[in-house]
Amino acid sequence: MLKSIRLNLIPLTAQQLETGLQSIKQLSMELNIPIIADLMSGVAAETITKKLAIMHDLPPELHPWCTYWLMVDICDNLAMGLVGFKGAPDADGSVEIGYGVNSIYQGRGYMTEGVGALLEWAFSHAECRQVTAFTLPANIASRKVLVKNGFREISSAGEEIQYRRTRD
């Protein structure tokens, strides 16, 4: 588990991801943490399915690089966001980050804080030299999260903007 000022970040196991897809209430009971009902639905559910396929083929020590980390508001003891990488660092030491937070919690700095905590964790591992992210030009909030965490825009070809943050 990672801690920041207002958040606990809990790396979910493959079994916990599967449970969350089947029943968010069951996962909530297992973790003893209330979870926003739609946190693992829609695009998140599709991404979790992809994460599970990747995790199935990797040794357990690499799972934290592939899973979602559950963002829990310390004051409310409520899980309201997800943040994670899309795999272990590649040969160039690069990983891609993705994230999402429930709309009720948007605009309060939680995503910036969660991404920052996970970046600190990633860069504490020698094999991680850079983190990339992709976002749509219209997603101003996501772009602000990245810039506040030291990312720089590196390309804007196609429908997405690519950002990169290198180890300090």
Model-identified regions with their sequence ranges:
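Conserved active-site tyrosine of GNAT-family acetyltransferases
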Residues: 146
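Glycine-rich acyl-CoA binding loop
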Residues: 109-112
